[in-house]
From Swiss-Prot:
Organism: Shewanella sp. (strain ANA-3)
Top-rank taxon, per record: Bacteria
Family matches, as PANTHER family: MALATE AND LACTATE DEHYDROGENASE (PTHR11540), MALATE DEHYDROGENASE, MITOCHONDRIAL (PTHR11540:SF16)
Record: residues binding NAD(+): G7, A8, A9, G10, G11, I12, G13, D34, N94, I117, T118, N119, M227
Gene Ontology cellular component terms for the protein in this record: cytoplasm
EC class (word): oxidoreductase
Example of a GO MF term: L-malate dehydrogenase (NAD+) activity
GO biological process: malate metabolic process; tricarboxylic acid cycle
Annotated keywords: NAD, Oxidoreductase, Tricarboxylic acid cycle
HAMAP family in the record: Malate_dehydrog_1
Subunit structure: Homodimer.
Catalysed transformations (reactions): (S)-malate + NAD(+) = oxaloacetate + NADH + H(+)
Protein name per Swiss-Prot or TrEMBL: Malate dehydrogenase
Amino acid sequence: MKVAVLGAAGGIGQALALLLKTQLPAGSKLSLYDIAPVTPGVAVDLSHIPTAVEIKGFAGEDPTPALEGADVVLISAGVARKPGMDRSDLFNINAGIVRNLIEKVAVTCPKALVGIITNPVNTTVAIAAEVLKKAGVYDKNRLFGVTTLDVIRSETFIAELKGLNVADVKVNVIGGHSGVTILPLLSQVEGVTFSDEEVASLTKRIQNAGTEVVEAKAGGGSATLSMGQAACRFGMSLVRGLQGEANIVECAYVDGGSEHAEFFAQPVLLGKNGIEKVLPYGEVSAFEANARDSMLDTLKGDIKLGVDFVK
């Protein structure tokens, strides 16, 4: 099993690489790529951790050596949010970065499962899909927008609010990965009820949690560590699915034939082909149905931005 992290010298990439070095199955290979010259050194640093995961780092303009033979590719390359920016402000820089990296993926490891972490995810996943289509290698079951951070935040905030064991909290988060497009289905959380006020405030907190971190770091960064953990959870789920483990389900932003938009975050069953099955997200409350329907123009606009960028 080979996992490649592109953008591995950044805040998310280093956290993700550390977690993968400690969690990937014995005998796995982990390759780190970043344009930054420090990247081989990050790999040397991590190589001193005593786990049976072989690690190599590559720097420079060309990610090809890191991508050769990769089963899973996780892309966190790009610029991070600063105070006053929203995820869409990142588009101008990150769109080109994702396009260029996916062009290399299309040539070097077209069958790999690809998880896009680089924001704005609503748009960068659409960019990746268009690039892969142009190259004639697009498989909608192998491309994912990583929205796991919205899920782990929801789990955490619900557990805190209700005094639950966080390990027992399961919640689907649907839609997209920015602002109003993030929709936690709180009505489905088992064993707990929320007042209308709690639903409204909790939903808003989950939607704005990225900004909460950006502001708390006061210009010193964005949500890198929690995102690293979220990306590791999702990456490990992809690996476990590839290895044939049963019942691996995660929410992700995918081209899953949704009635709502071309790309939509919902639960998917993972396996040897990536997505084995797109799962229904279940019954929703009136509040959730309204929030879902009113986000769609925003989401579709984000997707169109990505499609138009490549065309």
